[in-house]
């Protein structure tokens, strides 16, 4: 099971974090700071897997963002690397060509896509099409809620 997922920039700015195990805020901040230092200090040619505390850390850099997952000891690192890649593919499909600014200004969509893809640290749906369809339906529903309607339409009389 995945314990948490972090997205951070090369400058060490946290852009997204998702925790799948209850952890205090103080401990989270400490873990994020430590892990960012470890990952950012590594050379590009080094392996994307590392042992850290009692966890395995799998990370991948895409452009200026690091996607970093902490998994339990018995979990498969290659599957986790593929999950990171699938998440990036979903972000790319939704945003066009995703960049750090898309994550910054549309963080709620990035979280929503992650929640459609992963639930409780485990894969919920591996199909890109079904995840993107669910996101598209949610967008349509949100657009309907935000569109101005008359009083008669609100009452179902129009």
UniProtKB/Swiss-Prot annotation:
Q: Which disease is it linked to?
A: MEDNIK syndrome: A disorder characterized by erythematous skin lesions and hyperkeratosis, severe psychomotor retardation, peripheral neuropathy, sensorineural hearing loss, together with elevated very-long-chain fatty acids and severe congenital diarrhea.
| Induction of synthesis | Up-regulated in response to enterovirus 71 (EV71) infection.
Q: Which compartments does it reside in?
A: Golgi apparatus; Cytoplasmic vesicle membrane; Membrane, Clathrin-coated pit
> Gene Ontology cellular component?
AP-1 adaptor complex; clathrin-coated pit; cytoplasmic vesicle membrane; cytosol; early endosome; Golgi apparatus; Golgi membrane; intracellular membrane-bounded organelle
Q: What is this protein called?
A: AP-1 complex subunit sigma-1A
Q: Give the principal location in a single coarse category.
A: Golgi
General function of this protein: Subunit of clathrin-associated adaptor protein complex 1 that plays a role in protein sorting in the late-Golgi/trans-Golgi network (TGN) and/or endosomes. The AP complexes mediate both the recruitment of clathrin to membranes and the recognition of sorting signals within the cytosolic tails of transmembrane cargo molecules.
Query: Biological process (GO) annotations?
Result: basolateral protein secretion; intracellular protein transport; melanosome assembly; platelet dense granule organization; receptor-mediated endocytosis; response to virus; retrograde transport, endosome to Golgi; vesicle-mediated transport
Tissue note = Widely expressed.
Record's superkingdom?
Eukaryota
Similarity-based family: Belongs to the adaptor complexes small subunit family.
Q: Entry's PANTHER family?
A: ADAPTOR COMPLEXES SMALL SUBUNIT FAMILY (PTHR11753)
Which InterPro entries does this chain map to?
Answer: AP1_sigma (IPR044733), AP_complex_ssu (IPR016635), AP_mu_sigma_su (IPR022775), Clathrin_sm-chain_CS (IPR000804), Longin-like_dom_sf (IPR011012)
What are the protein's GO molecular function terms? clathrin adaptor activity
Q: Which Pfam families match?
A: Clat_adaptor_s
Instruction: Respond yes or no to whether keyword Transport is given for this record.
Output: yes
Q: Which residues carry this modification: Phosphoserine?
A: 147
**Do you know which SUPFAM superfamilies this protein is assigned to?**
SNARE-like
- Specify the taxonomic lineage: Eukaryota, Metazoa, Chordata, Craniata, Vertebrata
Q: Does the keyword Membrane apply?
A: yes
Give the record's keywords alphabetically. Coated pit, Cytoplasmic vesicle, Deafness, Golgi apparatus, Ichthyosis, Intellectual disability, Membrane, Neuropathy, Phosphoprotein, Protein transport, Transport
Q: How does it assemble?
A: Adaptor protein complex 1 (AP-1) is a heterotetramer composed of two large adaptins (gamma-type subunit AP1G1 and beta-type subunit AP1B1), a medium adaptin (mu-type subunit AP1M1 or AP1M2) and a small adaptin (sigma-type subunit AP1S1 or AP1S2 or AP1S3).
**What is the recorded membrane topology of this protein?**
Peripheral membrane protein
């Amino acid at each position: 099971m995945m314990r948490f997922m972090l997205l951070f920039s090369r400058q060490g700015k946290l852009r997204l974090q998702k925790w799948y195990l209850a952890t205090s805020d103080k401990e989270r901040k400490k873990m994020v700071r430590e892990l960012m230092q470890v990952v950012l200090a590594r050379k590009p040619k080094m392996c994307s897997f590392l042992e850290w505390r009692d966890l395995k850390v799998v990370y991948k850099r895409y452009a200026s963002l690091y996607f970093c997952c902490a998994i339990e000891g018995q979990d498969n690192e290659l599957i986790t690397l593929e999950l990171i890649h699938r998440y990036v593919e979903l972000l790319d499909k939704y945003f066009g060509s995703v960049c750090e600014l898309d994550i910054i200004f549309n963080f709620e969509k990035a979280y929503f896509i992650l929640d459609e893809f992963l639930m409780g640290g485990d894969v919920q749906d591996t199909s890109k099409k079904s995840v993107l369809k669910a996101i598209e339906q949610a967008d349509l529903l949100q657009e309907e809620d935000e569109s101005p309607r008359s009083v008669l339409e609100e009452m179902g009389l129009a």
